[in-house]
């Protein structure tokens, strides 16, 4: 919905990880595993070397999720999530009607160890709903996770970071995604967040003021802007859970319509506050001019910060070399000059 906002938020997340853990993230994992070729291009320009995405059947086709793939036109390695093995824990662990119930750590690791020849890794991913919402503490979910490392050691199954997987990747097959995909529901698309008119209207009205918000200096407006973009706000407006899909949630609202009304009331107040600072009478051309000025200033700030960093590191900024000045002729005393003149005229 807004490329500039997306990039700004990704940069803030990266900076937060660096400040907390001292590591620069190189593999991207988007909210709800939302991904597309276009998103892949954005994050590649931001310095990421890989991305996690859903191993959706309509994207993979006959291909296996247990391989790495390449983005079609930028240098980005793709790591698909193994949907079945992930959902075995996230959604089936507590399902008494499942034919593999109960799921034990040794059974699960045996499945992992039985991968086909050539399949060197498996991405297993789930959200925190697997711990406490989908699977309560009395289901044994915590004991299951505690036992996994030991069972993995017995079967000589190792754990790897995404960056380690990418470093060992040898597969150059391309994986293309046209429309954005996610890990939600059977469709694996974005319909859980923008699949009905309620969600569409809320999203349109929110991002219609994105340029004005970027010009604001009010910290309260900036903070509320981020909260209003949280995906759960639109997830609660979904009507898909009436059909019994996994979109069913334990949200704070009785219905999607109540979620919509509450959100729009808050958004209306927010839009009024933004309008007080940057009225809608200011046309987009003027706003774009202001944003261009701000972006140029930000670029200059970055350049100055880099120069300061070099100075702190003991490196002087490069200066243009000056051409050495021509030596000045020495002036001789007048008396000697006169004598010399006499000698040259004497015969």
List each model region and its residues.
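Intrinsically disordered, polybasic Lys/Arg-rich low-complexity tracts
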Residues: 313-347
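Active-site and substrate-binding clefts of carbohydrate-active enzymes
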Residues: 67, 72-76, 80, 95-96, ...
